Amino acid sequence: EKGLSFKDNFFDRIIAIHVLEHLPNLPVTIKESSRVLKENGLFQVVIPCEGSLAYSFARKISAERIFKKKYKMDYDWFIKSEHINKPDEIFEELSKFFKIKKKYYFPIPLPFEFCNLCIGMNLELKT
């Protein structure tokens, strides 16, 4: 999240899989990623469909259930402190420097967040 020690246009590809939703200073990370990515480079991102019906249900029957059983604590405070950036916020920040080349939805290949768990994107720098 701080300035990276790489020169401008250094990387052919940057990969951020289940990372961007956790970063407290998302705008700086996105800006730095755009600075160090080569002009024809690829920024590959995967984010959870946080808040969607499918994601919420999947969490209830998996991570939340396991967390509550193991720690005997409420799960909401934990996940809210971990997933601080929602998909709309991430899309907004990405759109300042990148354009979406391709978008993938998982597990249902329909362009709707409510029925999916994750969104994958191939992005390129705006020209």
Where are these regions (language model features)?
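Short acidic donor-binding/metal-coordinating loop in glycosyltransferase active sites
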Residues: 1, 19, 33
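Short, well-ordered turn and helix-capping elements at secondary-structure junctions
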Residues: 1-2, 107
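Conserved short-loop catalytic and cofactor-binding motifs
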Residues: 2, 17, 75-78
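A short acidic, Gly/Pro-enriched loop at the edge of an enzyme's catalytic core
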Residues: 2-14
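Activation segment
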Residues: 5-8, 23-27
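A short SAM/SAH-binding and catalytic strip from SAM-dependent methyltransferases
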Residues: 12-24
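S-adenosyl-L-methionine-dependent methyltransferase catalytic module, highlighting the catalytic core
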Residues: 24-38, 42-126
